[in-house]
């Protein structure tokens, strides 16, 4: 049974919607799957603000129902809540995720090798733009970890498309992140690759960043160093880009305290309400 006391009173437990599977094509003809959440009281005559959601990993896959992993169970619940609050939400299973075959998982030039999965971000945005029920001036994006990376990429490279974003413990410079899973990595010894890795990072495009962002991070994160958000905030400050920060002291990557998940999602909703409505 559900631990009812852990469910926020505002969560629409009695009016969950069934998301729809959506398949769209990236510019290089790769098919991308997603789950589309329409508002609870959907009206075909209205135009809604819309959000893209990107999972972490990247070796993950979002589902058409609650997830078996707690991190993504929470994210699915948040997408349900956003739909209940009159947002159209598209959760994107971008390339390098699992469940669509080896070629999809080991996608050419993904991640630090060229960020080819960014094509899926743009394809998802174009799908939303093609819908008559979406307000093209109010498209945002959010995600955690690898999804935070793609959120930051969207804002850095295409603030002309994305009006706002929420970046939860996202990676912003591949040359920093690689050291987490390959401690011997030395960018100075691999200059060509290091240049490619940097150019596959949000920090490489921060000069183009215009749209507001909320940065959420625990300061004891061992997966994505807290310094990633600190360094991005400093770069945004120099660019006079509006940003907010929510920092959880002594919190790790996958938040240990349920109340911190709730607080982060409350802040996410509040930020989008102020910046996109």
Question: Model-flagged regions — what are they?
Answer:
Residues 1-277:
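Serine-hydrolase catalytic core recognition
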């Amino acid at each position: 049974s559900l631990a009812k006391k852990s469910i926020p009173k505002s969560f629409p437990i009695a009016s969950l919607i069934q998301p729809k599977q959506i398949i769209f094509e990236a510019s290089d003809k790769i098919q991308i799957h997603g789950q589309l959440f329409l508002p609870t009281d959907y009206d075909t005559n209205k135009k809604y603000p819309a959000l893209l959601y990107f999972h972490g990993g990247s070796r993950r896959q979002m589902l058409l129902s609650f997830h078996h992993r707690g991190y993504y169970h929470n994210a699915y619940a948040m997408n349900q809540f956003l739909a209940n609050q009159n947002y159209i939400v598209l959760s994107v299973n971008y390339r390098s995720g699992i469940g669509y075959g080896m070629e999809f998982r080991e996608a050419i030039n993904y991640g630090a090798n060229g960020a080819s999965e960014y094509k899926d971000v743009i394809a998802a945005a174009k799908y939303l733009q093609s819908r008559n029920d979406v307000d093209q001036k109010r498209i945002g994006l959010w995600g955690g970890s690898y999804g935070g990376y793609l959120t930051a990429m969207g804002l850095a490279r295409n603030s002309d498309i994305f009006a706002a974003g929420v970046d939860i413990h996202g990676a912003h410079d591949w040359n920093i992140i690689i050291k987490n899973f390959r401690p011997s990595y030395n960018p100075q010894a691999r200059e060509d690759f290091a240049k490619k890795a940097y150019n596959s990072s949000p920090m490489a495009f921060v000069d183009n960043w215009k749209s507001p962002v909320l940065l959420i991070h625990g300061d004891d994160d061992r997966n994505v160093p807290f310094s990633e958000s600190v360094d991005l905030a400093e770069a945004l400050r120099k660019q006079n880009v509006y940003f907010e920060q929510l920092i959880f002291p002594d919190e790790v990557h996958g938040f240990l305290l349920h109340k911190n998940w709730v607080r982060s999602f409350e802040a996410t909703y509040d930020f989008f309400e102020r910046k996109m409505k």
